[in-house]
């Protein structure tokens, strides 16, 4: 039996049935990481020793009947912007290259309490700023489907790790599409929950009003199970919402009869690759054949999402990243004259070019004389976009959209063209601005053999509708792993 080809829930069942031990599961993941990591570069930190020690502890708790959940004993990879006590947490930046947090992020803690074994921390765009995982100080992650292409970003390490079967599932964070877009590029499933569903405590902030942690896995069942485990009300996060229910697995039902699905005309016009469009519309046809009612509608306001997002996110980032100054933790320049020079040199040497670009942009839009013209206008635009979605959800249960305008671009193509990189988030950003849930599922491949993902968007707190729709489509299409993951089997 090949352990790494199992989904997280399948592996959990086999551990429970004593067909596989937790140590065997962890060793299988470590062996796969050692086999493909030189090509893919999904991880910034691999904690072999800690994972094996934890595997033995978890096995004992399972044997004693103290851990019975579906993810008990299943290994996981964590995006490197979530604090893990005692384990390096770098945000893929030089400035945090030596940072070991004193506490663990709430979402990660929830997983640990459910018996998860952390394999290590995954690569990402520096401070989650980017769409290709090329801005990482620790080198780019490569797409397991084609090593000359990017995995997407900023959670590219998490999505590539799942696609390459280095981990059964992973956690990512999504500020403007950072779970959904790389999931599409890597042919895996990723959920960005409603804002406030998963605690942000211990997530190193980029854009606080937009950031949300979510799962990445091989199928919808895994994602729903992980989301059910990490979602919780947390008084330590002032934006955390006490929900009536955190039950997402009951939505794993193969039925879309009567489900009203809206297709925004504005998402399927110019700028969308023909093969991506064809694959998504084919998937919509499948849902229609299964009884869904599909209709086109107008959502023209979304064209203002990108400028609004980059003003708001950069403004919040310039404030959030002020704490990295070389004083309390992280990198400090070796030679400096006086305090201000130390700040300046530590930040200039510690941050990469994309992070500096966004800090400067954010500082500019918040400066006196420009605040009203940019930041305030962006906040008003955000409110209008939310209203447009509210109106759409009066009529539709689920909105279908692409996750990205193309399949995964080649390495280096977007990195040198910031506008091109920013436009890559065109279909995902509005979901963050409106605080909505979204899921990406693989629906096919283009002529180069690269995965195409379809994004399903739901109303606030209606994850179950998008999970049910995604699950229904998934019953018609078996999961496919890239050749790189299957070599030597």
What spans do the regions from the language model cover?
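An N-terminal boundary/leader segment
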Residues: 1-53, 289-291, 364, 482-489
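Short helix-loop capping/hinge segments that flank enzyme active sites or metal/cofactor-binding pockets
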Residues: 71-91, 253-262, 315-386, 437-453
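General small-molecule cofactor/ligand-binding pocket signal
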Residues: 119, 293-298, 439
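Short glycine/serine-rich loop/turn segments
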Residues: 71-213, 266, 315, 401-419
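Residue-level signal for inorganic ion chemistry
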Residues: 29, 51, 104, 223, ...
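Structural helix-boundary/capping segments
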Residues: 35, 113, 164-169, 175-271, ...
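Short alpha-helical scaffolding segments that buttress acidic/His motifs in well-ordered protein cores
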Residues: 25-29, 308-309, 355-363
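Serine-dependent amide/ester hydrolase catalytic core
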Residues: 13, 301-302, 325-433, 481-487
């Amino acid at each position: 039996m090949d352990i790494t080809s199992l989904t997280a829930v399948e592996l959990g069942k086999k551990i429970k049935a004593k067909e596989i031990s937790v140590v065997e599961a962890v060793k299988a993941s470590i062996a796969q990481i050692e086999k493909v990591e030189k090509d893919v570069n999904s991880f910034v930190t691999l904690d072999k020793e800690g994972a094996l020690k934890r595997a033995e502890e978890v096995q004992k708790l399972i044997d004693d009947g103290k851990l019975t959940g579906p993810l008990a004993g299943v290994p996981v990879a964590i995006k490197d912007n979530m604090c893990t006590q005692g384990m390096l947490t770098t945000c893929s930046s030089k400035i945090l290259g030596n940072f070991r947090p004193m506490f663990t992020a709430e979402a990660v803690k929830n997983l640990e309490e459910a018996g998860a074994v952390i394999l290590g921390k995954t690569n990402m765009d520096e401070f989650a700023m980017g769409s290709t995982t090329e801005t990482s100080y620790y080198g780019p992650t490569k797409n397991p489907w084609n090593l000359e292409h990017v995995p997407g970003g900023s959670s590219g390490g998490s999505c590539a790790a799942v696609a390459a079967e280095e981990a059964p599932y992973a956690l990512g964070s999504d500020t403007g599409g950072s779970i959904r877009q790389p999931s599409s590029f890597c042919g895996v499933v990723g959920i960005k929950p409603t804002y406030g569903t998963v605690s942000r405590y211990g997530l190193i902030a980029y854009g606080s009003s937009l950031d949300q942690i979510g799962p990445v896995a091989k199928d919808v069942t895994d994602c729903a199970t992980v989301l059910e485990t990490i979602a919780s009300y947390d008084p330590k996060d002032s934006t955390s919402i006490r929900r009536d229910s955190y039950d997402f697995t009951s939505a794993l039902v193969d039925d879309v009869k009567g489900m009203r699905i809206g297709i925004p005309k504005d998402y399927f016009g110019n700028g969308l690759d023909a093969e991506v469009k064809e694959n998504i519309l084919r998937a919509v046809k499948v849902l229609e054949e299964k009884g869904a009612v599909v209709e086109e509608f107008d959502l023209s306001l979304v064209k203002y999402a990108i400028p609004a997002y980059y003003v708001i996110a950069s403004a919040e980032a310039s404030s959030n990243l002020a704490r990295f100054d070389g004083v309390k933790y992280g990198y400090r320049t070796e030679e400096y004259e006086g305090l201000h020079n130390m700040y300046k040199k530590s930040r200039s040497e510690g941050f990469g070019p994309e992070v500096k670009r966004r800090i400067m942009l954010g500082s500019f839009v918040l400066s006196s004389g420009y605040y009203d013209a940019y930041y305030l206008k962006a906040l008003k635009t955000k409110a209008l976009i939310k209203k447009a979605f509210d109106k759409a959800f009066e009529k539709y249960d689920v909105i279908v959209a692409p996750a990205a305008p193309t399949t995964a671009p080649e390495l280096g193509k977007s990195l040198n063209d910031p506008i091109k990189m920013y436009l890559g988030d065109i279909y995902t950003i509005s979901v963050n601005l409106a605080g909505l849930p979204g899921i990406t599922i693989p629906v096919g491949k283009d002529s180069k053999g690269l995965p195409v993902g379809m994004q399903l968007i739901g109303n606030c707190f209606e994850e179950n509708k998008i999970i049910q729709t995604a699950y229904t489509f998934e019953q018609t299409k078996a999961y496919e792993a890239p050749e790189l993951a299957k070599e030597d089997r």
